[in-house]
Amino acid sequence: MGRFLLVTLSLLVMAFFLNGANSCCCPQDWLPRNGFCYKVFNDLKTWDDAEMYCRKFKPGCHLASLHSNADAVEFSEYITDYLTGQGHVWIGLRDTKKKYIWEWTDRSRTDFLPWRKDQPDHFNNEEFCVEIVNFTGYLQWNDDSCTALRPFLCQCKY
């Protein structure tokens, strides 16, 4: 019995420290993931204003970049839980050259692009910023006018 209690207690302590290692430095209400902290903001902003808002937290903060299906699923659940409205959500991807060359604001690799069907399309030659689409369960992306007002997802390295 004593050995079982010791093993159980050791496992609980280890789980506590492992969980703390991932979330110890994120501000309250931010989601810890992959060494970054993420937060969805319900304020409606243009893509540029959203990026500037994210940058105000500290150097290295940007609109979020997503790099895997696991990221997409995690953020889908997080956005669904914390977004008070039902709008699409800005992320940190855009086509600054307007030639279907998509780049993240944090300069990370563009290695995951779960576009909605028939997207991106640069509709009317006006859509160069990327949003996560609400009616896909926040799992697929669309290009939209950078001046549209949207909630947004920030990421910061803490």
From Swiss-Prot:
Signal sequence, start to end: 1-23
Disulfide cross-links: C26-C37, C54-C154, C129-C146
Keywords: Calcium, Disulfide bond, Glycoprotein, Hemagglutinin, Lectin, Metal-binding, Secreted, Signal
Compartments reported by the entry: Secreted
Tissue specificity of this protein: Expressed by the venom gland.
Residue numbers covered by motif Galactose-binding: 119-121
Superkingdom classification of source: Eukaryota
Primary localisation category: secreted
CDD domains: CLECT_REG-1_like
Positions glycosylated per UniProt: N134
Function per UniProt: Galactose-binding lectin that binds to and agglutinates erythrocytes in a calcium-dependent manner.
Family according to the record: Belongs to the true venom lectin family.
Protein name: C-type lectin galactose-binding isoform
Species in which this protein is naturally found: Pseudechis australis (Mulga snake)
